[in-house]
Regions:
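Compact, glycine-rich, soluble single-domain proteins
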Residues: 6-99
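Acidic/glycine-rich phosphate/pyrophosphate-binding loops and surrounding catalytic core
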Residues: 85-127
Length: 127
């Protein structure tokens, strides 16, 4: 059986996604961190950003925008706990602009602005 990392992204009271992947890139507060097989155990504080799931050829296969949180990395698993998560495929500049404008809290506005900035910079060609 081929080795991989079991990753789980969860929000409060709900598991959003569980799967296996060769590599995962998480947005740490001190910079992006690539989680590899047999990596030393660590706990990483996450910033608002993009979680990327990579295949063996380092091609991005899945993307998720998260709103902060922590990543618990140990024994070939990466458990990401976050307040909000949105799959990249489910993003849209117009809809996320409306969500940003309707947001009450500044941190929610900043989260949606981060998504909008990413989409306007890189476009939808990556979907």
């Amino acid at each position: 059986m081929e080795k991989g990392i079991i990753f789980r992204i969860s929000r409060p009271y709900k598991v959003y996604r569980t799967a296996m992947a060769p590599k995962i890139v998480v947005p740490g507060v001190k910079g992006d961190l690539t989680v590899l097989v047999d990596r030393a155990p660590t706990l990483v504080q996450l910033r608002d950003g993009l979680v990327q799931v990579l295949d063996k050829a380092d091609k991005v296969t899945e993307r998720y925008f998260i709103k902060g949180g922590i990543a618990d990395i140990a024994r070939n698993r990466c458990a990401i706990s976050t307040e909000k998560v949105v799959a990249y495929e489910n993003t849209d500049v117009e809809k996320d602009t409306a969500k940003r404008d309707a947001a009450i809290y500044d941190e929610d506005k900043a989260y949606y602005q981060m998504i909008i900035d990413y989409l306007t910079t890189f476009g939808n060609k990556e979907k």
